[in-house]
């Protein structure tokens, strides 16, 4: 979230799209209801199903799964055509006025630079025109034909209300009503908050779904505002912490990037990741990248990391390609993987194409599962009839189960959707042989060191040089790790005026104190300030709220620097006055920025060219994404890889995302509409949490049996009655479940045909105390978003028959 949960109450419009907050986030949804009840907010829901969120909405609009970009691009067109934008915000705070290269183009579904053989783009044309000083050229009149504003207008001009209705199946009147209400928040004293979740991310255009919404917020002037923002409702407790700490194949903590094999030395790595300002006098905060990186290396390797050895740069692995789950399991399938560590995850139930996952795991020599509970992954080799019809005798994978603790059995912090780090304390000791994850990893670390010391080996420096200065080396404590994340002064630190800001050995209070000379250490720069010499800020529990905005700066701690709303400089106009005084976050008092949040802007006075989007080299919000996105600098509608239309009404020659993450062997497992005529989409229920709570008896009682949902019209066509057992199949396999026939799903008229949707809850499997069921991801396709590689769980093709 750029904002936070409580801030939702400040919105005038709450738009829930790509998520189902009332059911998947029932506690957090209270703030949407608070906005309705106490701020007279309008709640809008756009969803393929009429959900519990929709049941309390003021406006509900149905949509075909996988067509969100068409809907949102139609909103962009409406705002532009009807001049329903915050014009001053767009002019000064976005890149609308910057000029784009003359060789950038878009034609027939493809942007300039496409290489059909490699299925990727040369993005060099997706950039600005630069002057002799290296700064992007600008036309503040917005009349130049190559300015972002005019290119955007031309790009979205195709997304008329009729086109939206034809592709999305959303009735035109419903779409226009949504546009009208959203447009009302272009006024400076009104805001919209967008709430989304996996319903947007789990598509082959997932990242572009979110970007399109962010573009709407920029046009409306809602970024940086109380009651505004781009707000992801995280699907797991602490999944925000996972991304913060960089637990991805090409990432490092604090959203730093793991070096690639092309970056052969530290200099080339830092040059590739340290941007230069592209407009004069910008904060360009990523220019501090070397400070964050060197401090990370000092935390990783301690005294072993020195300037003379480039801070241990050579000890980091260098990636040759992205090892996402789609790629890695294909490597397993090809016999290129010997062993697999699975920590706190259940791939057999969570990854797409479950039958392929089981086949891949069967080719391993060994697998280690670290989890508090028995998972389908840990018992994938067992035969459970139709739901897991394997031959145990033919599977030679050796499975090691290491029981771990759950959150209630350990101290630590949880990072919520709003970036708040909240400390929690152990409720009870772990049962039996269970150990916490830190203790398990410490045991592996020490045993590996002992083996290398005894037997020798090559390439051992990353392990042997690692800093491991815990009081109990075999059982690191949560507070020690938290302090490492925060960071220390390794020498006395002085500011530019010679004033001492931290003594050697003291905890740091700000990432502004990090240095690139080896005098500071921090494992995660964005967490600096979370545990200072004044104590554990994550344990703060003062919920006083003098502003009434819900920022509660004394409750827990939010990164960065306890700031509750990112880019809050944008909440004030170019003169430093709040767009809406009633929702003032920060303002200029004549000498500094002050207010109801931690300012993100230093002391740059109003009237200077410094833009509010401090992480961007141009200081502006990007309506044109220059060279960042895989499939284009503007969003474009591409059909799901399994489309019920068999074409793309906008450009039949480019049906689906042209740079989608799809391997040849997986392409053979994609279905066609002739055999699988209905859209399948997966989702969660309030009564269960993924595949975890089927181990809990009360949850199993609340939702005891696997079911799927279909419309009354589809049920009539297929001769299915409510409560019948049905078989749902895709090109990859089948599941059996009870049919729930409901009016909450309806057919949509799309491109001259009726499109039906089959709703598939995800929570069942063959482990736990709940009734045994089939794994929903038996049906889903092994294809991913080109940016995040997230699989397409939300739009695929199925058939359904009475069992």
Residue ranges of predicted features:
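Extended redox/cofactor-interaction regions of prokaryotic respiratory oxidoreductases
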Residues: 1-34, 41-44, 70, 218-410, ...
């Amino acid at each position: 979230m750029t904002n936070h949960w409580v801030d939702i109450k400040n919105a005038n419009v709450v738009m829930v799209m790509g998520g189902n907050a009332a059911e998947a986030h029932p506690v957090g949804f209270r703030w949407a209801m608070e906005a309705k009840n106490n701020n007279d907010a309008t709640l809008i829901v756009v969803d393929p199903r009429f959900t519990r969120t929709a049941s309390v909405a003021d406006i509900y609009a149905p949509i075909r799964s996988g067509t969100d970009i068409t809907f949102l691009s139609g909103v962009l067109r409406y705002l532009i055509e009807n001049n329903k934008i915050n014009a001053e915000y767009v002019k000064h705070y976005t890149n609308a006025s910057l000029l784009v290269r003359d060789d950038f183009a878009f034609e027939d579904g493809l942007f300039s630079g496409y290489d059909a053989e490699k299925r990727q783009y040369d993005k060099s044309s997706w950039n600005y025109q630069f002057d002799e000083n290296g700064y992007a050229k600008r036309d503040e009149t917005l009349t130049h034909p190559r300015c972002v504003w005019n290119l955007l207008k031309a790009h979205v001009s195709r997304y008329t209300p009729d086109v939206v209705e034809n592709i999305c199946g959303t009735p035109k009147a419903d779409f226009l009503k949504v546009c009208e209400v959203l447009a009302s928040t272009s006024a400076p004293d009104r805001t919209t908050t967008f709430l989304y979740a996996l319903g947007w991310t789990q598509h082959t255009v997932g990242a572009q779904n979110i970007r399109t919404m962010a573009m709407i917020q920029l046009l409306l002037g809602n970024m940086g505002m109380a009651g505004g923002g781009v707000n992801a409702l995280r699907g797991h407790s602490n999944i925000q912490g996972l991304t913060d700490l960089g637990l991805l194949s090409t990432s490092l903590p604090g959203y730093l990037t793991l070096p690639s094999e092309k970056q052969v030395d530290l200099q080339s790595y830092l040059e590739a990741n340290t941007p230069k300002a592209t407009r004069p006098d910008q904060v360009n905060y990523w220019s501090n990248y070397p400070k964050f990186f060197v401090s990370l290396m000092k935390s990783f390797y301690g005294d072993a990391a020195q300037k003379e050895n480039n801070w241990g740069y050579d000890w980091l692995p260098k990636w040759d390609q992205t090892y996402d789950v789609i790629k890695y399991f294909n490597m397993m399938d090809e016999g290129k993987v010997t062993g697999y560590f699975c920590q706190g995850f259940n791939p057999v139930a969570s990854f797409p194409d479950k039958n392929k996952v089981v086949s891949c795991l069967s080719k391993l020599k060994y697998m280690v599962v670290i989890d508090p509970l028995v998972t389908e992954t840990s018992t994938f080799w067992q035969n459970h009839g139709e739901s897991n019809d394997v031959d145990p005798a033919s599977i030679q994978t050796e499975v090691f189960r290491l029981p771990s603790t759950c959150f209630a059995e350990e101290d630590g912090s949880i990072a919520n959707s709003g970036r708040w780090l909240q400390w929690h304390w152990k409720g009870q000791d772990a049962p039996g042989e269970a150990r916490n994850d830190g203790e398990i990893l410490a045991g592996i670390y020490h045993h590996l060191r002992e083996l290398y010391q005894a037997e020798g080996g090559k390439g051992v420096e990353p392990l042997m040089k690692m800093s491991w200065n815990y009081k109990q080396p075999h059982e690191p404590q949560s507070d020690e790790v938290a302090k490492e994340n925060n960071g220390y002064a390794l020498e006395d630190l002085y500011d530019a005026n010679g004033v001492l800001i931290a003594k050697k050995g003291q905890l740091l209070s700000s990432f502004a104190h990090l240095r690139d000379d080896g005098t500071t250490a921090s494992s995660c720069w964005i967490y600096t300030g979370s545990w200072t010499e004044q104590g554990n800020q994550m344990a703060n529990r003062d919920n006083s709220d003098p502003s009434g905005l819900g920022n509660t700066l004394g409750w827990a701690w939010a990164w960065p620097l306890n700031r509750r709303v990112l880019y809050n400089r944008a909440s004030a106009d170019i003169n430093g006055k709040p767009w809406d005084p009633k929702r003032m976050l920060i303002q200029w008092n004549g000498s500094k920025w002050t207010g109801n949040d931690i300012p993100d802007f230093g002391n740059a006075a109003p009237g200077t060219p410094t833009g509010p989007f401090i992480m961007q080299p141009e200081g502006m919000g990007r309506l044109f994404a220059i060279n960042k996105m895989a499939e284009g600098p503007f969003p474009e509608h591409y059909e799901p890889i399994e489309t019920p239309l068999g074409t793309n009404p906008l450009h039949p020659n480019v049906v689906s995302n042209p740079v989608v993450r799809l391997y040849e062997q997986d392409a053979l497992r994609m279905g066609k509409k002739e055999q699988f005529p209905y859209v399948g989409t997966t989702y969660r229920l309030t009564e269960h949490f993924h595949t975890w709570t089927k181990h809990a008896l009360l949850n199993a009682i609340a939702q005891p049996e696997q079911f799927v949902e279909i419309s009354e019209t589809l049920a009539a066509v297929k001769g299915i009655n409510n409560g019948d057992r049905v078989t749902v199949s895709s090109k990859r396999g089948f599941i059996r479940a009870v049919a729930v026939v409901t009016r909450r799903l309806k057919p949509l008229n799309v491109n001259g045909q009726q499109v039906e949707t089959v709703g598939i809850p995800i929570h069942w499997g063959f482990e736990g105390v709940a009734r045994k069921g089939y794994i929903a991801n038996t049906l889903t396709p092994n294809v991913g978003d080109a940016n995040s590689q997230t699989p397409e769980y939300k739009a695929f093709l199925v058939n359904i028959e009475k069992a």
